[in-house]
């Protein structure tokens, strides 16, 4: 049975870095669905209610369940705008969902953003506009990740939870 890992949180939390490390750790037959890549690079659409990114992510999620051992879905993924995606995840993966939410202070996400190669693309004012405090899904239990948990520790924690 295919397993789904969901990584969510505000911009600059570390979702993409953890997702890529997990894909490497799990190896072959691990599908990575990056919300930003699909929305900004593949579709070139804005985020929000009714975004075509949600529809494409649903199709890709279904493909992943049928064809991959592990599917990693990562992104801000606003709990209201992507409700249909989360409902699909529950239908497709049932109890094989491992969901994590980065609950970090704004200052920490800003600090982390400053370490990224693309930090020049947007700054503090944009991050403040996008900020959503404690944007939990509700219908899917999410384990909270805090600033005290480092990259390797996070990857190890998720990997061991999914494998065992």
State where each predicted segment sits:
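ATP-binding Walker
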Residues: 13
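Hydrophobic anchor at the beta1->P-loop junction of P-loop NTPases
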Residues: 7
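P-loop (Walker A) phosphate-binding loop of NTP-binding proteins
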Residues: 10
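Conserved phosphate-donor/acceptor-positioning beta-strand/loop module used by diverse small-molecule
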Residues: 93-112
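Small-molecule kinase domains that catalyze NTP-dependent phosphoryl transfer to phosphate-bearing small molecules
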Residues: 115-157
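Walker A/P-loop
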Residues: 16
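Glycine-rich phosphate-binding loop used to anchor ATP phosphates in small-molecule kinases
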Residues: 52-94
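Conserved substrate/cofactor phosphate-moiety recognition/catalytic segment
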Residues: 20-66
